[in-house]
Amino acid sequence: MNEGEILFQFTTWLIFLISYLIGSIPFGLLLTKLAKLGDVRTIGSGNIGATNVLRTGNKKVAALTLLCDILKGTLVILVIKFLTDPIENNIFISLAGFFAFLGHLFPVWLKFKGGKGVATYLGVCLGLYWPAAIVFITAWIVLFLITRYSSLSALIAVIITPIFVHFSYPYLYAHCILVIMSLLVMIKHHANIGRLLVGKESKIGTQNGGK
């Protein structure tokens, strides 16, 4: 391996590390503390995501948490797209988004106990291939309006989105990474799935349990 290849490998992994660290920023925890709403990990499901932040009763902080968690996935990809050829480096761009997603799920700052990845998943879709984000949002909204279950809406959305990408986006690497991300979201929702199956999952607006 020559000097140029070593530098390339170092730069690549450095970018992946930075992407992971950006994804690891626990906005739900930070914003609730800044708003003096307490530790979101002691509220509802104990999750640091926007749905659980909403259970504090502060819709503005919940919305800001959602936006920040989405942007973690989007900005990482858009910056790299701006600096490189988005077609030639599609796998590199996809992996950077994946590392940001992993950071949200397993943040080093919180002993690797993070969120469930739904918002950052959406952010990666938005940065990588915006029509996928539209499909995700549409699926989530339709399911939520029907069921009022945030968790179920997210689970259906992460199933539909990779299927859409498979038939509409030409880059296999991105599709494979999106499938892995969908599986991780499902794994993170294992408790929600259990509650859904026995009819004990809480809907948006309740104060306990849920996503």
UniProtKB/Swiss-Prot annotation:
Instruction: Provide the Gene Ontology terms for cellular component.
Output: plasma membrane
Molecular function per GO? acyl-phosphate glycerol-3-phosphate acyltransferase activity
- Domain of life of the organism encoding this protein: Bacteria
Membrane-crossing ranges are 10-30, 63-83, 90-110, 126-146, 152-172
Provide one Gene Ontology biological process annotation. phospholipid biosynthetic process
Q: How does it sit in the membrane?
A: Multi-pass membrane protein
Enzyme Commission no:
2.3.1.275
Where it sits in the cell: the answer is:
Cell inner membrane
Report the coiled-coil segments.
Answer: none
One Pfam family assigned to this protein is: G3P_acyltransf
The protein's UniProt keywords, in alphabetical order, are: Cell inner membrane, Cell membrane, Lipid biosynthesis, Lipid metabolism, Membrane, Phospholipid biosynthesis, Phospholipid metabolism, Transferase, Transmembrane, Transmembrane helix
Q: Which residues form the signal peptide?
A: none
Which biological pathway? Lipid metabolism; phospholipid metabolism
Q: Which reaction does it catalyse?
A: an acyl phosphate + sn-glycerol 3-phosphate = a 1-acyl-sn-glycero-3-phosphate + phosphate
User: Which PANTHER family does the entry mention?
Assistant: GLYCEROL-3-PHOSPHATE ACYLTRANSFERASE-RELATED, INNER MEMBRANE PROTEIN YGIH
Q: How does it assemble?
A: Probably interacts with PlsX.
What the protein does comes down to:
Catalyzes the transfer of an acyl group from acyl-phosphate (acyl-PO(4)) to glycerol-3-phosphate (G3P) to form lysophosphatidic acid (LPA). This enzyme utilizes acyl-phosphate as fatty acyl donor, but not acyl-CoA or acyl-ACP.
Sorted alphabetically, which NCBIfam families does this protein's record hold? glycerol-3-phosphate 1-O-acyltransferase PlsY
| Family classification | Belongs to the PlsY family.
HAMAP family the UniProt entry points to: PlsY
- Name the record gives this protein: Glycerol-3-phosphate acyltransferase
